[in-house]
Amino acid sequence: MEGVKFPFGGIINDFNGRRKCYKQDWLAAFNSGVRILAPTLYIFIASALPVIAFGEQLSRETDRSLGIAESLASTALCGIIHSVFGGQPLLIVGVAEPTIIMYTYLHSFSKSRPELGQKLYLAWAGWVCVWTAVLLMLLAMLNACNIISRFTRIAGELFGMLITVLFIQEAVKGLIGEFLVPKSDDPSLEVYQFQWRYTNGLLAVIFSFGLLYTALKSRRARSWKYGFRWMRGFIGDYGTLLMLVLWSAFSYTVPRNLPEGVPRRLELPLPWASESLYHWTVVKDMAKVPPLYILAAFIPAIMIAGLYFFDHCVSAQMAQQKEFNLKNPTAYHYDIFILGIMTLICGLLGLPPSNGVIPQSPMHTKSLAVLKKQQMRKKMVQKAKECMREKASNSEIYGRMQDVFIEMETSPKATSVVKELENLKEAVMKADDGGGETKGKKFDPEVHIEDHLPVRVNEQRVSNLLQSVLVGLLILAVPVLRMIPTSVLWGYFTYMAVDSLPGNQFWERLQLLFITPGRRFKVLEGLHASFVEIVPYKSIVMFTLFQLLYFLICYGVTWIPVGGILFPLPFFILIALRQYILQRLFDPSHLQVLDSSEYEEMVGAPQRNSSFGFNGELREAHNIPLSVVENSEDEFYDAEILDEITTSRGELKHRTLSVKEDRSQMVKIYNHS
């Protein structure tokens, strides 16, 4: 991203860059045919489930002024706008936890002011959105995205940890609430007698922990040693939804003599009911908000604008990691401008705004990377085999494969194709020529193309558009959503919290504090973050304690009744602290590793034992044909490999060998550092 200096320069550059590939963004999806439906369904489920959970949380915190239907409507509307008019179509938008937190504080403030109250809550929130939209557009016009490089790992991981703790907090509050009488209900009803409340609470514990355990297990289904590959892949992609359906079905197996309302289920009005239709006309009440509160709305708008700017840019960064090898240009400035427009529309319609979300955005890119590689690999293998039947030379085979690659390269900037295929060319040309590692080996299209084909992503807009439409159609499925027990959602909140921890180096360093010196070698034996081998233990401890203290400050701010709306402020301050203060407290080289922009992982021990696979010397000793190995269900495939090298937030790991050859000496130094 170029550092544009003049106003509107970033937006203009982004718009012109994306305009050149806009037509191809649509054609690329149509060329994929029905295969585009697989990543569409995958990202639809990954996007819809959190929105349903957040919608239920929003409903409880705002006395049902907003809820699941409004959250789904916002996600669908903003998703459609962004997929059609946005700059980066791989970026997924939706209602996220920061929006829920801010709208909760707005509701608390509105209820405490008689001039506003519950009646004008959405109208005042609309004014907050108007100011937020103005600020976001100004940030885009003034090229504020040029500072995106200052969003380092420490801020992102602290924010992620805060959201994780708030998820767990919400799950605990929800479970405790299952034993209590809801605030808006009549406590004299039979369903709220002690024995039935206790029964409902125990069932809630079973359902929530049941979903948590099974969802976490299904999350890593691709690495299971049981089942066929297609089955493992299906469970890995859609396991969370399957578990939600499974535990919702289990909730109907309770004895029939339980009163209605045990277990408790989602309560949401039909989209055509009068209380739902009110949101579309909230703009009429905005004129009733006193002028003083219209001006006061600017204060929370500053916090929300900064929060959206940070979250949206980081989500876009994660969706466009350089390892994905994207060819179309970025559009940070333009997308922030579009975000401002979407926030304005949502505010006027009485909906909670949507912004870029993690991990859905990098998950979307990852699913399209697998699809594109499968398509390229299939066509290139077919062309290579066709040439081999014609007894073409190796140079002719490579030339034909390169033509296929160029033909499928949809980007207008396909000038580096030859350079990207250098490794494949070398492998093809050296085969049968007695050179390098391929000495004495015949060129095998299946093996060589798989090993040397560069990563490609099917950059298009259709999957984002279709998943947004599907999210919108969920609003019509209210009768089905009402069948979900609320306790299952508390389990899903806990699942989102636990699943977000792996790959968070702040969490990894916290665990390191509780490992005794004599057992630290266990960390080095497995896969571990690079800082473990590079940074002295004392520096790791000091940096972690600073981060822990700052996290407690951020979390403490969220407990301030009305002032909690300022919770994004510490994260803005942290950017300055990182740039000017931490540089003096820590060795710059150590700080660069601890706060690096990329996740680097060291290989401490072999991950797989080839003695259980049909490969290498074992295959040759038993005279097993190569075709048997290639068609074996036990081989690793693209999606499984991407799962292994991706953190839970969608961040690609840089995996390298240990920087120390003498392991025993390294352990000794590490234990005494």
Swiss-Prot record:
The residues exposed to the Cytoplasmic compartment are 1-35, 97-121, 182-197, 255-289, 352-468, 578-673
Q: Which of the residues are on side Extracellular?
A: 57-75, 143-160, 219-233, 311-330, 490-556
Primary localization class, coarse: membrane
Q: Which UniProt keywords apply?
A: Anion exchange, Ion transport, Membrane, Transmembrane, Transmembrane helix, Transport
The UniProt transmembrane annotation reads: 36-56, 76-96, 122-142, 161-181, 198-218, 234-254, 290-310, 331-351, 469-489, 557-577
MF (Gene Ontology):
solute:inorganic anion antiporter activity
Q: How does it sit in the membrane?
A: Multi-pass membrane protein
Its annotated compartments are:
Membrane
A GO BP term here is: monoatomic anion transport
Which Gene3D superfamilies does UniProt cross-reference here?
Answer: Helical hairpin bin
* Cellular component, GO annotation: membrane
Q: Does the keyword Transmembrane apply?
A: yes
Q: Which family does it belong to?
A: Belongs to the anion exchanger (TC 2.A.31.3) family.
Q: What does this protein do?
A: Putative boron transporter. Boron is essential for maintaining the integrity of plants cell walls.
Protein name, UniProt field = Probable boron transporter 7
- Gene this chain is encoded by: BOR7
